[in-house]
Amino acid sequence: MTAPLERIKLILQTQASSSQLGTSKRSSYSGFLDAMIRVPQEQGFWSLWRGNFLNICRYFPAQAINFSCYDLYYDAYRYMIRPETAYSHHLLPFLAGGSVGVTSCTILYPFTFCNTRISVDVGDNKSIKREYYGLNDCIRKVYKSDGYRGLYQGLAFSACGMFLYRSTYFGVYTFGKLTYLSQGTPEIHSVQTPLLVSLFFAQLASVIATLITYPMETIARQKMLLSGRGLQSYESYRHMVGRITRNDGVFGLYRGMFAKLLTTVCGSLILVTYDLITDHYKKYKSKRFRRKLEDFKKSDER
């Protein structure tokens, strides 16, 4: 459902470094509505889903890593920090969330890289030739030009941005729930909040995380576009930020953010759904254990 929004976001976000846009054959997109109208006209309606299959292949493992590793990191940080104050308690979700973000980003980065390169390819094989036709084609061409290093362009900034995003995403959500309930314990799974309240804090967490980290994501995405052009075309992060702000101002770091904010609804729904599932599972385990304990006591009395 959100694939067209994701592709429009990527195109707007990276067009300052695109070799296909800003030429006599195809001008740059002025904004969200301009891109939504012109992309189907220039590349066909189904081009709005270009790169979506690869994004799906990346998305499920990423969410699995995020939620399965969150509790592991949370328990590890709790053991190392041994929190005694409210501040140290609330710090745990931020650290655990950031750590799972870096983990998933690093493991799945080649998929993220290829998804970006394929999605921002605005070629239609008529006026502009397409650069990549799939995952294998993208990897082969980038590796031939730059080696494996080319597949990891922008990893440093992307990992830093993901740490901030996930730490804010999980941290704000947890902190908001605990503040609402005025509980003394920071354990996310030991408290229950109304569904609408959980959705509100999840959406708030997604929006805040996006506003904070979007410039870092923009720089990382544009860094990805330098791969495949030869090592001589590589640009430092400092020079890239200077080029973007010099040409478009600070606003250039936030191009495409409106489309990104529209997709945050899905992120908040996933977080709340995961919370509900884990709560029900813990209740089920607790009831089952209590039932087994009662049966054991009855058999012992006999």
PLM regions: where:
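Membrane-interface alpha-helices at helix entry/exit sites of multi-pass transporters
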Residues: L48-R50, Q153
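Short, flexible active-site-proximal loops enriched in glycine and acidic residues
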Residues: L48, Q63, I81-R82
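Blade-loop segments of beta-propeller domains
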Residues: G31-Q43, R50-F53
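Hydrophobic alpha-helical transmembrane segments of multi-pass small-molecule transporters/permeases
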Residues: G51-Y59, S158-A159
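Hydrophobic transmembrane alpha-helices of multi-pass solute transporters/permeases
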Residues: M1-E6
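Specific transmembrane alpha-helical segments of multi-pass solute transporters/efflux pumps
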Residues: N55, Y59-F67, R166
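Flexible extramembrane linkers and terminal tails adjacent to transmembrane helices
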Residues: K9-Y29, L33, F67-R149, Q153-A156, ...
